[in-house]
Amino acid sequence: MANYQTAHAQERRIQELDQTVESIFDVRKRMGKGAYGIVWKATDRRTKNTVALKKVFDAFRDETDAQRTYREVIFLRAFRCHPNIVRLVDIFKASNNLDFYLVFEFMESDLHNVIKRGNVLKDVHKRFVMYQLINAIKFIHSGNVIHRDLKPSNILIDSKCRLKVADFGLARTLSSRRIYDDLEQDGMLTDYVATRWYRAPEILVASRNYTKGIDMWGLGCILGEMIRQKPLFQGTSTVNQIEKIVTSLPNVTKLDIASIGPSFGSVLLSRNIQRDRRYSLDEMMKNCCDDGISLVKALLVLNPHNRLTAKEAIRHPYVSRFQYASAEMDLHMDVVPPLKDHVRYDVDQYRNSLYELIDRETSCSNRTVSNSTPSSNRDELPKPVRVTKQARTTSAKQPTTSPAERKKEPSSVEVTQSRKNIKLLGSAHKAQSKEINHMESAITQVSIASAPPAAAPPAPAATAPAVPRKSGDKSVPKCQHNNAAVQRELAAVAAAAAVARRKKSSWQSQAQSQGKFHTEAKAHVQTAIQTQKDNIKDSPPRMIQESQSLTEAKAPIPKNRYSNKMCQEKKYKKKHHSMSCITRDTFPSETEHRQQREERAYQRQMKRELQLKESYRRRIEAESEPLKETTEQESKTIKVIEQKVCEHTEKKADESLSKDQQKDSITFGTCVRERIHHLELEMEKCTEELVDFVELNADVLNYANVSTHLKKLQRSKESDEKDEDDRRALPEGIGGPGSQNYEIFRQEQEKERQRQVQEFLARDETNEYDNLDLDHAYRAKYYTAYKEIGKELNPAPDSGGRDSGSEHSPGRDNYTTYADYFLKYTTPQQNWNDLERANGLQREHDRIYGLFWLNDRRQEEKYRRKLAQNDQEELPVHHHKACRHRHHKPNHHAPYDHMRPTEDDIQEADSLPESN
């Protein structure tokens, strides 16, 4: 039951606020509670701003807590200019000298709660959060300070994704080697789970080699948690934490262990731990982008010297898109606390250093005190009792000094104390003014009662009443603060004089002691007034007048020479007051004169500006007209140039087209002419060769062989009827049948050639080159065929003649077609000369046709090779209908004889299909 009551009382004390803090801030709700403090959301009554009020309970309980509190205040003040570090607004001390109050700017949430909610942060938000975090750490590291406690709960964030780093209780400098460190003592403790998951390996193994890489490891853990939405290494103890880290990272080398430094925990890193691929960084962050995985791997490196620095990390592709020059903030000097960071001092030294810091800030900002309770964070007013006690102690230590010296020494101490109080006080409250008035009346009564009735000076004149103050006036003039300090000094001097009078020797009379007292009091008053002279002069004339009247009313008036001097001083003050009134009366005229001068100067300046603007406008109008004309001319010129360019382009296109057509026509005409000329030459050659062949083989081409061939190769009657006109016999007496048919052949061939030339020339004009028909140039079907010769002219197959079926017969199974080239014989008694002539013509025709066919095939092969080499399509101007020829059928009945023409060799042209 007792333990429960104690715990309940402790909890109630934690929840309570100091009276001074409660009077300044309106607490709205509690935001959170930690191991060292509690945070409220509050509103400042003075500025109406929403702030975060943090109470550090038992801040000076021991040296460790005192050093933690001191570090947090010092480093927050040093880094308060950075936008990504939480700003310390104000600090307050508690009345119990144990608790401590810190006032921060208000932030809506922290990163831990944002991650815990789920998919609140998108990829761009994570990148921006990481950029701000790296930017803040870079600024901290530029001051040679490390945070050492980076975790999501220490990173504040608002709805606009603005981030601020907080909680600098574990931060420290790297300027010198430390003697004591709180992390060395509890580095291996298992109850500090919240931060263990984000600690670097060198801290887990209790290494003394602290570097800035500690914070970079924490950044990697935070980024991994944002991407994975849960911590990367959730160790249940320090050993388990090290095992999880080693499992996820690559193999540990001796160089990695040496980089951490010798420690008892380095043995854990050197152990062979079985690695599971499921817990590697690649597997845990498989859903992340490549840039994010790359940054995490670069930060989570076992060797602290190989980790990315803050300056390198801010240029990483994952966050480089947010980098801009204006955000680059660095400290160009190290942050050095007033108390050395590597030495642990007493609790009182840390407390006194912080209290002095509060006093200096109070003096600089001139803040007002909300009430005069003892729990205020401002220094209390010195009580006269304490001053008297100090004076007694001082006089007891110096018994040989004179009474004047004994009174002078405590007064100097009080003057110094009063100066300090004047700097610390921002204003005085009504309760303080009442207390001062009561004290002054008590001092006056003591000074009057100290003298005997016989030697008492005449009663002083009635003091002037104090200037009343309105209850609604909240501002207190500065001169009243100074006057209050003077009155306190007078009270201290009077109290010290009273004590001295009670202890003085019996031989000194009361009149003498009273005179000395007044003389010394006058000197001390003059000294106090001189110390506050500058502050009084800085006040407005009305406040100076009020302070002077208040001083005259409250100052004690002696009745001897001192009173005469005081009267003279009053006259001087009245004169000074009249001069101030004159100055105050003439002040408005000078002000009005100055305002008039300023107004005239302003009017002149405005007039000059208007004139300048008008001149600029006229100049622009004058310059714009020629510019418009020039622009119009240029536009017209550009249009003309465009038209000419278009016409020139069209003309060039037409010329190129006509040139191509002309070139094609010239090429086609040249091709046709060359072809005709070539055919003529070949016909002449074939004629000569045919004649030579007939002369050489006259014995072979006898009448018997010809009759045999005519019988087998006689044409049908239908074809004879179609060519009846062409096969009409010449009149008797005009040449032989062979000469008649040859002359007809030559005439018809010449006509056909002329007709084809005309057709080619006509097609050359119409560009119709697609279907050229040159079949008639090679066919010879204009000779009349012989009629069937009687069977009696054919020898028996085995008679032994030329046409017999024996091996020695040269005309066996040779079915030649001479019928198309010779006349039909009605009687077998035809003239032998005519037959010989016909046979010669037939041989000549066969030779010419064979040469033509071979040459044509040769030309076609050359033409095809040329097309294949150029890899181009066959042009229409070169296209003509190819003549298809039958292949020679192999004869399996008789051996080949070169002197024996076959039907395929002699009459192949007759079997070709008619062209369309």
UniProtKB/Swiss-Prot annotation:
Phenotypic consequence of T190A: Does not lead to transitional endoplasmic reticulum sites disassembly
Annotated TM spans: none
Protein residues bound to ATP: M31, G32, K33, G34, A35, Y36, G37, I38, V39, K54
Biased composition (Polar residues): 364-376, 390-403
Family: Belongs to the protein kinase superfamily. Ser/Thr protein kinase family.
Function according to Swiss-Prot or TrEMBL: Atypical MAPK protein that regulates protein secretion in a kinase activity-dependent manner. In response to starvation regulates protein secretion by mediating transitional endoplasmic reticulum site disassembly. Mediates inhibition of insulin-like peptide secretion upon disturbed ribosome biogenesis and acts as a downstream effector of TP53.
Protein's recorded name: Extracellular signal-regulated kinase 7
Organism of origin: Drosophila melanogaster
